[in-house]
C-alpha cells in the first residue's frame, strides 16, 4: 500500500530533494558569476562573507563576556546573580537563532564560492599521506544537495563513490565562518589524517585553518588543533578529550572549546554500531588482587572439560537414537542440553544441518519453555553450567557448584550468595546480641556477601572467556596482549579492554600477563557525547534502514541523496548451503573461476578466523590473493588500492568500514566490474549493504552475491528454522545449493530480528545513562566553575550559610551545645562557645547567624593572613579534590547498582525505575558530602611552614611507595574500560598543618585519600 502512495505522490526523500532544487539553481548561477573574478577577488568574497557573520555574532559575544564578568564579582548578591543568569540564558537562545539565520542567508553565496574554488584547484598536485594527488573534484548538483542536507542538521545517505568527503567541505566551510569551530568526525586516525590533508588546499585558499586530532598527540598540540576553524578527528579521541578536560586540574590542561557543529562520516558506524560501548577513562584499583583468576583457572578448565565430555556423550546418544527414530524425544532432550551447554560445538552445528534435526531441537525447546520456562531447569540440572548465547550469559548450576566445591575442598555453600535482607532481619531480632555484636555480625555478613559475589563473578567471567569468546574471532593475541577486534570493521582496537574483569579472564585463559584491575574515573556514552553539540549531521552509504533509530535517539532526519550516475550493479539472491565446508569449497571454486577470466573479486568475511581459513584454501589452489584483517591492518591502503585491478583477489574482514573507494583498473569494466562475494550474512543489513556498495561506484558495473550456510552464526541463532524446513521438503542433498528470493527474504527477516534486539539494547543503555548524564552535567558544571572562576570565596560562603543552618538544626532539638561546639571544631577548626540557656532562649535563626558570623570572621582572618594567589589555590584545590574523589566513588557505586539492578525484576519491580530512584538517592548524598567536605577543606587547609617541609616530604615518599602502582597505571584508560591518557604531573598542592586529623578527614600528605586509608593506617 505504501509503495502505491509513493508512486502516486512521490516518496519522502524525493520531496526533500525537490524542496532544495531552487537553491541549487541559485548556487550554480552565483558560481558562474564568480568565474570571472581573479583569485584575490575570490578570496575577498570569502573575507566579506566571514565579516558578515562575525558582524552579527561579535556584539552578542561581547555582551556575553560582560555578563560573565558581572557574575565573577565578589560583591554580587544572589538576586543579582539570578538576574544575570537569566539574561545569559536569553542571550544564548538569541545567539543560536542569529547564527542559524545569518548562515541560511549566505548559504548560496558560500556554496557557490566553494564550488568555484574547487574548479580553480583542478589540475593542481598535492601530497596526501605520502602520495601525489591531482585535484579533479568539483561538486555535482547532487553533492550540493548533500551539503545543504548536512548544514540542516540531517543525515545524508549517499552511495559509495559519490564523494561524501567533498560534500562535507560545503557545510564545513559555511559553519567555520562563525569562528566557533567545526568538527569532522571519522572512524579512525588514518581517515582523519587523510581527509584533513586531502581537503586542506580548499580551506587554505581562503585562509581557514585546519587541524587533526590523532591518538597519542600531546595535550598542547591537541589544544592548538581544536583552536583551528576546522578539526578532523575520531569519535573516540573527541570523546576522551571531553572526559579528560573534565578531569583537568588547571585551565591550561583543557584542550577543547565549546561544542558547536559536528559532521560524522560513516554516521551509522559511529552513532549506532559503537553506541553499545560507552567511553570510559579508568585508573587502577588500589590493592587489587590480580592473581584471583589464576587461582580459579585450573578449576574452571576441569569444569569445562567435564562439560565437554558430557556433551560428547549426549551427542553420541542422540545420534544412536535418531538412527532408529528421527523424532525420539530423548534424542531431542540430549541435543537441547548440548545447545544449552556448548552451543558452538562443531559436531552439534553439523548435526543441525541434517534433515529434521533442527526441527526436533526446536520442538523440544518449545516444550520446556512452556508456562514461562517452568521446566527448563530439568534441562539445565544435568549441566555443570548453562550458556545463553543470545543473552551472552552463563549460569552455574547446582551440579557445577558441587563439582567446584570438591575441587576446592570447600563446602558448596561458598558458591551461594547469602540472603542479606533475611540475615539482617535475623540479626536485628536476636535479643541476645548487644548493639556492638549486631554491628560486628552485620559487617561479617557484608564481607561474606562481598567475597562470595566476587568469587562467583570471577567464575562467570572465566566461563564466558572459555565458552563465548573465541581467539581470532572476538579477539586476537599479539605481542603477548589480548587485543579486541571490532565486530563491525574487523579492525584491532588498540588500548581498549573489556570491562567487569572479562578482559583479565581472557588474559588468564590465553596465558598472557594479566593487567591490573581498573575502576571508572569518568564515563559517557557515544549518544550523550554527541548530544553535546548544538548542531549534528552525518553522512553514510547506509542509513535508511536505521532511520527510525536516528530520529528517536538523536532527532536526526535521514535524506536519501540521488546518485550522480545510475547504479548498474547486479545484486543476486543468496546461495544457501547446508554446511560451512560445502560453502567454503563453493567460494574457492568461484574465486578460481573469476580469477581465470581476470575479473577482480573482493571476498568479505565476518571474522579473522574465516578470512584465514579461506586464505589457506586459496593457497592450496595456488590462487594469488591479498588478505586484509585485524592482523594485516598495516597494509590497508595498499591492498585497497589494488583491489579493483584485473585478476586481483582480496579477502577482507568486514570491508564495510574501510572508508576507501575501490577504483577499477584497465579492462575491468568489460569483464563486469568488481565482483563482491560475501562469505556469510552479517547480523546487520547495513553492513551487507555497505559490502555490496563497494562495487558499482559512479555508474561502474559490478556484481554481488552472498554465500550462506545453515551453520553460520546468524542462521544458527536467529533464522534457520524456515530455511531448514524448505530444504527438508525439497530433499536437499549434500553439496546442493538453493538460490531463491524467498530464502533471501527469510535471511533478511533474521537480520531484522537481530537489529531489533540490538536497538533495544542501545535504547536501554541510553535510558540508564540518561540518569547518570543528568548527574554528570551537574558535577562537571560545578567542577568547571571551580576550575575557571578566578575567586571561589562567594561559593564557599554560600556553602557556609547552608552548613550553618543544617548544623544548628541538627543540635537544636536536644540543645546539645557540646555536640555543636565539637562538630564546628572538627569540621571547620573554629572555636565556638554557646551555653545551653542561650541556645534554648534564642531562636534557631539567631544561633545560625552567630555560627555563620563566627566562621566568617575566621575565614576573613585567614584571607588577610595569606597572599591572594595562595588563598585562590586553596579554594580551587578544595573544590576540585573533593569533587574528583567523591565523583569516582559515586561512579563505583553506580556501577555496583547497575550490576545488580536487574535482579529487582524477580520482585515484580521495573529495574529502570528502581535504578532511577536509587541513583537519585545516591546523588543527593553525593552532593551533601561534596558540599560538606569542600567547606571543611577550604577552612582547614594552610600552606606548610618551611621547617615542616622535610617531614612532609618523607611522609609523601612513604605514601608514594604505597601508591606506586596507582601512579604507574593512573594513565591507563581504555574504552570498554578506557584509553591511554598521558596526564602531566600535578603541581604541588597546599597541605593542612592541623595537629591531629580525624579518621574520615582528607589525609594531610596531599594524596587526596581519607586519613584512615592513607597515613593513618
Curated annotation (Swiss-Prot):
Which GO cellular component terms, listed alphabetically, does the Swiss-Prot or TrEMBL entry include? cell envelope Sec protein transport complex; cytosol; plasma membrane
Q: How is the cofactor bound?
A: May bind 1 zinc ion per subunit.
Q: Which residues bind ATP?
A: 143, 161-165, 661
Cofactors needed by this protein, per the record, are: Zn(2+)
Record-linked Gene3D superfamilies: Helical scaffold and wing domains of SecA, P-loop containing nucleotide triphosphate hydrolases, SecA, preprotein cross-linking domain
Where is this chain's protein located in or outside the cell? Cell inner membrane; Cytoplasm
Task: Give the reaction(s) catalysed.
Answer: ATP + H2O + cellular proteinSide 1 = ADP + phosphate + cellular proteinSide 2
At which positions is Zn(2+) bound?
A: 1003, 1005, 1014-1015
Q: Which GO terms describe its biological process?
A: intracellular protein transmembrane transport; protein import; protein targeting; protein transport by the Sec complex
Q: Which InterPro entries match?
A: Helicase_ATP-bd, Helicase_C-like, P-loop_NTPase, SEC_C_motif, SecA, SecA_CS, SecA_DEAD, SecA_motor_DEAD
Q: What is its EC number?
A: 7.4.2.8
SMART domains, sorted = SecA_DEAD, SecA_PP_bind
Q: Where is this region: Disordered?
A: 978-999
UniProt cross-references to SUPFAM superfamilies, sorted A to Z: Helical scaffold and wing domains of SecA, P-loop containing nucleoside triphosphate hydrolases, Pre-protein crosslinking domain of SecA
Database matches in CDD domains = DEXDc_SecA, SF2_C_secA
Q: Which UniProt keywords apply?
A: ATP-binding, Cell inner membrane, Cell membrane, Cytoplasm, Membrane, Metal-binding, Nucleotide-binding, Protein transport, Translocase, Translocation, Transport, Zinc
Q: How is it placed in the membrane, per its record?
A: Peripheral membrane protein
| Gene Ontology MF terms | ATP binding; metal ion binding; protein-exporting ATPase activity
PROSITE patterns noted in UniProt: SECA, SECA_MOTOR_DEAD
Please give the subunit comment from the record.
Answer: Monomer and homodimer. Part of the essential Sec protein translocation apparatus which comprises SecA, SecYEG and auxiliary proteins SecDF. Other proteins may also be involved.
Name the protein family: Belongs to the SecA family.
The record describes the protein's role as: Part of the Sec protein translocase complex. Interacts with the SecYEG preprotein conducting channel. Has a central role in coupling the hydrolysis of ATP to the transfer of proteins into and across the cell membrane, serving as an ATP-driven molecular motor driving the stepwise translocation of polypeptide chains across the membrane.
Q: What is this protein's name?
A: Protein translocase subunit SecA 1
Amino acid at each position: 500500500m505504501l509503495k502505491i502512495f509513493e508512486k502516486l505522490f512521490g516518496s519522502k526523500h524525493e520531496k526533500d530533494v525537490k524542496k532544495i532544487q531552487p537553491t541549487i539553481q541559485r548556487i550554480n548561477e552565483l558560481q558562474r558569476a564568480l568565474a570571472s573574478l581573479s583569485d584575490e577577488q575570490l578570496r575577498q568574497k570569502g573575507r566579506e562573507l566571514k565579516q558578515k557573520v562575525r558582524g552579527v555574532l561579535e556584539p552578542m559575544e561581547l555582551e556575553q563576556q560582560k555578563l560573565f564578568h558581572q557574575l565573577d564579582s565578589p560583591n554580587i548578591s544572589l538576586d543579582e546573580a539570578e538576574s544575570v543568569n537569566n539574561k545569559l540564558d536569553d542571550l544564548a537562545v538569541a545567539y543560536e537563532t542569529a547564527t542559524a539565520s545569518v548562515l541560511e542567508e549566505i548559504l548560496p553565496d558560500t556554496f557557490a564560492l566553494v564550488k568555484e574554488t574547487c574548479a580553480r584547484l583542478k589540475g593542481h598536485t598535492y601530497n596526501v599521506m605520502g602520495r601525489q594527488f591531482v585535484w579533479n573534484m568539483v561538486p555535482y548538483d547532487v553533492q550540493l544537495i548533500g551539503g545543504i542536507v548536512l548544514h540542516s542538521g540531517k543525515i545524508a545517505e549517499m552511495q559509495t563513490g559519490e564523494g561524501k568527503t567533498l560534500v562535507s567541505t560545503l557545510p564545513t566551510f559555511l559553519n567555520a565562518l562563525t569562528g566557533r569551530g567545526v568538527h569532522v568526525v571519522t572512524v579512525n586516525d588514518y581517515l582523519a589524517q587523510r581527509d584533513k590533508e586531502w581537503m586542506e588546499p580548499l580551506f587554505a585558499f581562503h585562509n581557514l585553518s585546519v587541524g587533526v586530532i590523532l591518538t597519542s598527540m600531546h595535550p598542547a598540540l591537541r589544544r592548538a588543533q581544536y583552536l583551528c576553524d576546522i578539526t578532523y578527528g575520531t569519535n573516540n579521541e573527541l570523546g576522551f578529550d571531553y572526559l579528560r578536560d573534565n578531569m583537568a586540574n588547571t585551565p591550561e590542561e583543557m584542550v577543547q572549546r565549546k561544542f558547536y557543529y559536528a559532521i560524522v562520516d560513516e554516521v551509522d558506524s559511529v552513532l549506532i554500531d559503537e553506541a553499545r560501548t560507552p567511553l570510559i577513562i579508568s585508573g587502577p584499583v588500589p590493592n587489587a588482587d590480580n592473581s584471583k583468576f589464576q587461582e580459579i583457572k585450573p578449576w574452571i578448565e576441569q569444569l569445562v572439560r567435564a562439560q565437554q565430555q558430557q556433551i560428547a556423550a549426549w551427542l553420541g546418544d542422540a545420534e544412536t537414537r535418531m538412527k532408529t527414530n528421527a523424532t525420539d524425544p530423548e534424542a531431542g532432550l540430549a541435543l537441547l542440553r548440548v545447545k544449552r551447554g556448548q552451543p558452538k560445538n562443531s559436531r552439534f552445528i553439523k548435526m543441525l544441518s541434517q534433515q529434521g534435526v533442527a526441527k526436533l531441537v526446536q520442538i523440544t525447546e518449545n516444550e520446556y519453555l512452556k508456562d514461562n520456562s517452568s521446566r527448563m531447569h530439568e534441562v539445565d540440572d544435568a549441566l555443570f553450567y548453562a550458556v545463553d548465547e543470545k543473552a551472552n550469559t552463563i549460569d552455574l548450576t547446582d551440579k557445577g557448584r558441587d563439582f567446584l566445591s570438591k575441587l576446592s575442598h570447600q563446602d558448596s555453600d561458598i558458591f551461594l550468595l547469602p540472603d542479606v535482607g533475611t540475615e539482617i532481619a535475623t540479626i536485628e531480632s536476636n535479643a541476645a546480641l548487644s548493639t556492638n555484636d549486631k554491628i560486628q555480625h552485620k559487617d561479617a555478613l557484608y564481607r561474606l556477601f562481598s567475597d562470595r559475589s566476587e568469587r562467583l563473578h570471577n567464575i562467570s567471567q572465566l566461563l564466558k572467556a572459555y565458552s563465548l569468546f573465541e581467539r581470532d574471532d572476538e579477539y586476537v593475541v599479539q605481542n603477548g596482549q589480548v587485543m579486541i577486534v571490532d565486530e563491525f570493521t574487523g579492525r584491532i582496537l588498540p588500548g581498549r579492554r573489556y570491562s567487569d574483569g572479562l578482559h583479565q579472564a581472557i588474559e588468564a585463559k590465553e596465558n598472557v600477563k594479566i593487567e591490573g584491575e581498573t575502576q571508572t574515573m569518568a564515563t559517557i556514552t557515544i549518544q550523550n557525547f554527541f548530544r553535546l553539540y548544538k548542531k549534528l549531521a552525518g553522512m553514510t552509504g547506509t542509513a535508511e534502514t536505521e532511520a527510525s533509530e536516528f530520529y528517536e535517539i538523536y532527532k536526526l532526519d535521514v535524506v536519501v541523496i540521488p546518485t550522480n550516475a545510475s547504479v548498474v550493479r547486479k545484486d543476486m539472491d543468496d546461495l544457501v548451503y547446508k554446511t560451512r565446508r560445502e560453502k567454503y569449497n563453493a567460494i574457492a571454486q568461484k574465486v578460481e573461476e573469476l580469477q581465470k577470466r581476470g575479473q577482480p573479486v573482493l571476498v568479505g568475511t565476518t571474522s579473522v578466523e574465516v578470512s584465514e581459513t579461506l586464505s589457506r584454501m586459496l593457497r592450496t589452489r595456488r590462487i594469488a590473493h591479498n588478505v586484509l584483517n585485524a592482523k594485516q591492518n598495516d597494509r590497508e591502503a595498499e591492498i585497497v588500492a589494488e583491489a579493483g585491478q584485473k585478476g586481483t583477489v582480496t579477502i577482507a574482514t568486514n570491508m564495510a568500514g574501510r572508508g576507501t573507494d575501490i577504483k577499477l583498473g584497465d579492462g575491468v569494466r568489460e569483464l563486469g566490474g568488481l565482483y563482491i562475494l560475501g562469505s556469510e550474512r552479517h547480523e546487520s543489513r547495513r553492513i551487507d549493504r555497505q559490502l555490496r556498495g563497494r562495487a558499482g561506484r559512479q555508474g561502474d558495473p559490478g556484481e554481488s552475491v552472498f554465500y550462506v550456510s545453515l551453520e553460520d552464526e546468524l542462521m544458527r541463532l536467529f533464522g534457520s528454522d524456515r530455511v531448514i524446513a524448505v530444504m527438508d521438503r525439497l530433499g536437499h542433498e549434500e553439496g546442493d545449493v538453493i538460490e531463491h528470493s524467498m530464502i533471501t527474504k527469510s535471511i533478511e527477516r533474521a537480520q531484522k530480528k537481530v537489529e531489533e534486539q540490538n536497538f533495544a539494547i542501545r535504547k536501554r543503555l541510553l535510558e540508564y545513562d540518561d540518569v547518570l548524564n543528568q548527574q554528570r552535567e551537574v558535577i562537571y558544571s560545578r567542577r568547571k566553575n571551580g576550575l575557571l572562576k578566578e575567586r571561589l570565596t562567594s561559593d564557599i560562603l554560600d556553602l557556609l550559610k547552608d552548613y550553618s543552618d543544617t548544623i544548628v538544626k541538627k543540635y537544636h532539638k536536644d540543645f546539645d551545645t557540646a555536640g555543636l561546639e565539637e562538630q564546628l571544631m572538627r569540621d571547620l577548626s573554629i572555636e565556638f562557645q554557646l551555653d545551653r540557656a542561650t541556645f534554648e532562649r534564642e531562636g534557631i535563626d539567631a544561633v545560625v547567624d552567630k555560627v555563620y558570623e563566627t566562621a566568617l570572621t575566621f575565614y576573613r582572618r585567614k584571607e588577610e593572613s595569606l597572599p591572594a594567589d595562595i588563598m585562590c589555590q586553596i579554594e580551587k584545590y578544595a573544590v576540585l579534590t573533593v569533587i574528583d574523589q567523591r565523583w569516582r566513588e559515586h561512579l563505583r557505586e553506580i556501577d555496583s547498582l547497575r550490576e545488580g539492578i536487574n535482579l529487582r525484576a524477580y520482585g515484580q519491580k521495573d529495574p529502570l525505575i528502581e535504578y532511577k530512584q536509587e541513583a537519585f538517592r545516591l546523588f543527593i548524598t553525593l552532593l551533601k558530602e561534596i558540599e560538606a567536605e569542600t567547606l571543611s577543606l577550604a577552612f582547614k587547609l594552610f600552606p606548610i611552614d618551611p621547617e615542616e617541609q622535610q617531614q612532609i616530604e618523607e611522609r609523601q615518599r612513604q605514601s608514594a611507595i604505597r601508591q606506586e602502582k596507582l601512579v604507574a597505571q593512573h594513565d591507563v584508560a581504555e574504552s570498554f574500560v578506557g584509553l591511554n591518557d598521558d596526564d602531566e604531573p600535578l603541581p604541588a598542592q597546599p597541605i593542612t598543618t592541623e595537629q591531629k586529623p580525624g579518621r574520615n578527614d582528607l589525609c594531610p600528605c596531599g594524596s587526596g585519600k581519607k586519613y584512615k586509608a592513607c597515613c593513618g593506617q
